[in-house]
Amino acid sequence: MRKILLVLIAIWLFMPTVCAQKVGLVLSGGGAKGLTHIGIIRALEENNIPIDYITGTSMGAIIGSLYAMGYSPDDMEELLKSEDFKRWYSGQIEEKYVYHFKKNVPTPEFFNIRFSFKDSLKNFKPQFLPTSVVNPIQMNLVFVDLYARATASCKGDFDKLFVPFRCIASDVYNKKQLVMRNGDLGDAVRASMSFPFMFKPIEIDNVLAYDGGIYNNFPTDVMRDDFHPDIIIGSVVSTNPTKPKENDLMSQIENMVMQKTDYSIPDSMGILMTFKYDNVSLMDFQRIDELHDIGYNRTISMMDSIKSRIQRRVNLDNIRLRRMVYRSNYPELRFKNIIIDGANPQQQAYIKKEFHSSDNKEFTYENLKEGYFRLLSDNMISEIIPHAVYNPEDETYDLHLKVKLENNFAVRLGGNISTSNSNQIYLGLSYQDLNYYAKEFLFDGQLGKVYNNAQFMAKIDFSTAIPTSYRFIASITTFDYFKKDKLFSRNDKPAFNQKDERFLKLQVGLPFLLSKRAEFGIGIARIEDKY
């Protein structure tokens, strides 16, 4: 009965717009400068100007999608000012989700080079450079929480959102824009904002999709072709790349990857608001209040002109009620089935245990979040890309996980260079494998003037009801306290002022206080002083 009532209310609320003047809002990309769009939307709503369609690119896609799925300007500001949002674009993880139980003892490595011998040597491709500045670990997960319910509500058809929506991504292989009209809303927005080198691109229908601003940073053409509005309001917070500067890496990258965009709207077709920012960087999100107010004040100053072009009005209370009705129909985010791509059956069993204890047991987004960060706390899995697919039959979501396992082998390099006698070289070789349990072997050592060490470590993690870790360590260490002038010199070493340590240790680790680790161990050691 409640659903029938909501449908009747929705029909009554939406009916007056069927044959009225239609207004489309186009939002350009521009990084943090796109926060200006929120102020524009607020000013239009407060003055009863309708927004019937919305298209956007990059940051314009983020703001546009939030509005299209039923967020008010207040909702958007609250989200973009939150500590959660700061973690999303920085890639940082909350301390309570850092699972020390799965982490190894830190090593003095500067970097590691990963490789695998599973394929032929012809396909040998060591990996040691990141593909993006921002770690995607947060965005991969949060886009499920942010967009999955809206995708379920509109059944993957962006015309059925609270406001019909389009965004632009780029297919750099085929050198063309991708107009995102349907599918997973989170994927569409994520692709549209994936600025090369800054954010990692995502794969959609076997196409690697990048920031839409590469080919179309102001999609007025998509607005006209897809929605045919009577009038367009455009907000431009970006410009075409200027001549690159010798010491400005970002301007060089923009000139290499971004095509020229037409940022104009003919007077006969609509109203254009252009904002020029010289001192706002790509990630200046902390300036949201300032940028919001600039957009709001500019729109208010043009309101007489806007109202003269747009005769139709919409009641703000009516919009709020429509928004409440629309969002109340969002299916609750409850998961049941887990479908994993990129892992063998044994690995899938290991991964599933991190989320629920049985295949038919439901779990929440918080359970997903905890399991997600647990799995990524060790070195076994490099990336997990989750998607939520709604099942209307039982009103739960299937959790689809695209898993990328780390390469089995890693060479670890590190050390310390000093003008004193504390020079040190670190070198390690590790092997890891994931099946029903996770196992890792590490042989490493340090060579230096004072401290020399060789160590072997073997670790096995069991993903049981009470996760358990077993670790075996064998170590040989020498301290040489005799000081010489030559770096790394081993000649004429005296037989005094030296300490030798040898030990064998077996440790059992258990999770403690959610993200902490408790260890119990037994060992045997020998310490010998020579002086």
List each language-model region with its residue ranges.
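Short, ordered beta-strand-loop transition motifs
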Residues: 5-8, 203-206, 389-395
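Patatin-like phospholipase
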Residues: 19-57, 65-373, 377-384, 388-389, ...
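Sec-dependent N-terminal signal peptides
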Residues: 4-17
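Solvent-exposed, well-ordered amphipathic alpha-helical segments
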Residues: 15-17, 34-35, 52, 224, ...
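Gram-negative/organellar outer-membrane beta-barrel architecture
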Residues: 366, 371, 377, 383-531
